[in-house]
Swiss-Prot record:
Function of the protein: With EpmB is involved in the beta-lysylation step of the post-translational modification of translation elongation factor P (EF-P). Catalyzes the ATP-dependent activation of (R)-beta-lysine produced by EpmB, forming a lysyl-adenylate, from which the beta-lysyl moiety is then transferred to the epsilon-amino group of a conserved specific lysine residue in EF-P.
Oligomeric and partner information: Homodimer.
ATP-binding listed as a keyword: yes
Species: Proteus mirabilis (strain HI4320)
Catalysed transformations (reactions): D-beta-lysine + L-lysyl-[protein] + ATP = N(6)-((3R)-3,6-diaminohexanoyl)-L-lysyl-[protein] + AMP + diphosphate + H(+)
Positions bound to substrate: 76-78, 118, 251
Binding site for ATP: 100-102, 109, 244-245, 300
Annotated EC: 6.3.2.-
Lineage: Bacteria, Pseudomonadati, Pseudomonadota, Gammaproteobacteria, Enterobacterales
Example of a GO cellular component annotation carried by this entry: cytosol
Name this protein carries in UniProt: Elongation factor P--(R)-beta-lysine ligase
Family statement drawn from the similarity comment of this UniProt entry: Belongs to the class-II aminoacyl-tRNA synthetase family. EpmA subfamily.
Length: 325
């Protein structure tokens, strides 16, 4: 008889049945709003340049690639979905597998389900409202509240994140007993992220979902810079019961600016001893052809269902997490 004891799913069959129903309801939510479901590749010849993301790599050795064609498992379907938008797809969503060669734990699995959708003609606030509608439907929770990134820092840390210098940020870190990390950190955004995780996140989204919006422009990623305040980006995140659920943008449409951001990311990667990543030229070509003004958001489905079912770990809603795969 086999000595392997962990062959069974980590999630109960009852939870998997509830998960299937929630997934079905999510699809109905978008069908009722006329949003097209799409499928895009799970592998690509290019990948993200983000210094915080680590993709899985593989090789295709089939016909036409005898020397091996390097491919990356997708950390997000974003680039391919924006190529569809540039081809006049209209509003689209996708619920599929993504892969990140990073953490595995209470809220993380290297293979996970992402819900991502894009809304032409939506500004950031209108998309935030739609995310709120979905959360209320799936979680049966109260309507959300919203705080700007600046308001959140002022409320919980009594510091303005848009103007404070690194020395001031280190002073606040010391009050949170984080000097051992902050005193040697030279990157201002890393210091801000340290303070946000330790001094802001524990206070937000406890009773109702909380949107944090207008992140510093230096953390724009693929978001537009605000036309009203060039210190901030049109970017938001959503938190509920200690869990980061979603990350959204009013999407950057300028191909030249996007290339500059990718190149800046790669310079940072090299400085940090990380591999330089290939830039997705097809994605940039789509931006050059014309990405419509739009907003988009990526939401972690496993985390959402974990909250909906009131369980403690995403392994309670995934049949076979990485250590049982």
């Amino acid at each position: 008889m086999s000595e392997i004891a962990d062959w069974q799913p980590s999630a109960s069959i009852a939870n998997l049945l509830k998960k299937a129903k929630i997934v079905s309801n999510i699809r109905r939510f978008f069908a009722d709003r006329g949003v097209l479901e799409v499928e895009t590749p799970m592998m690509s010849q290019a990948t993200v340049t983000d210094i915080h993301l680590c993709p899985f790599e593989t090789q295709f050795v089939g016909p036409g690639a005898s020397q091996g064609l390097k491919l990356y498992l997708m950390t997000s379907p974003e680039y391919h979905m924006k190529r569809l938008l540039a081809a006049n797809s209209g509003p689209i969503y996708q619920m599929g597998r993504c892969f990140r060669n990073e953490e595995a734990g209470r809220y993380h699995n290297p293979e996970f389900t992402m819900l991502e959708w894009y809304r032409p003609c939506f500004d950031m606030y209108r998309l935030m409202n739609e995310v709120d509608d979905l959360l209320q439907e799936v979680l049966d929770c109260e309507a959300s509240e919203s705080l700007s990134y600046q308001q959140a820092f002022l409320r919980y840390l009594d510091i303005d994140p848009l103007s404070a210098d690194k020395e001031k940020l280190r002073e606040v870190a010391a009050k949170l007993d984080l000097s051992n990390i902050a005193d040697t950190e030279e990157n201002r955004d890393t210091l801000l992220q340290l303070l946000f995780v330790s001094g802001v996140e524990p206070h937000i989204g406890l009773e109702k979902p909380t949107f944090i919006y207008h992140f510093p422009a230096s953390q724009a990623s693929l978001a537009e810079i605000s036309s009203e305040d060039h210190r901030v980006a049109e970017r938001f995140e959503v938190y509920f019961k200690g869990v980061e659920l979603a990350n959204g943008f009013r999407e950057l449409t300028d191909a030249k600016e996007q290339r500059l951001r990718f190149e800046r990311d790669n310079r940072q990667r090299v400085a940090m001893g990380l591999p330089e990543q290939p830039i997705d030229e097809r994605f940039l070509a789509a931006l050059e052809a014309g990405l419509p003004e739009c907003s988009g958001v990526a939401l972690g489905v496993d985390r959402l269902i974990m909250l909906a079912l009131g369980v403690e770990r995403i392994s309670d809603v995934i049949a076979f997490p990485v250590y049982r795969a």
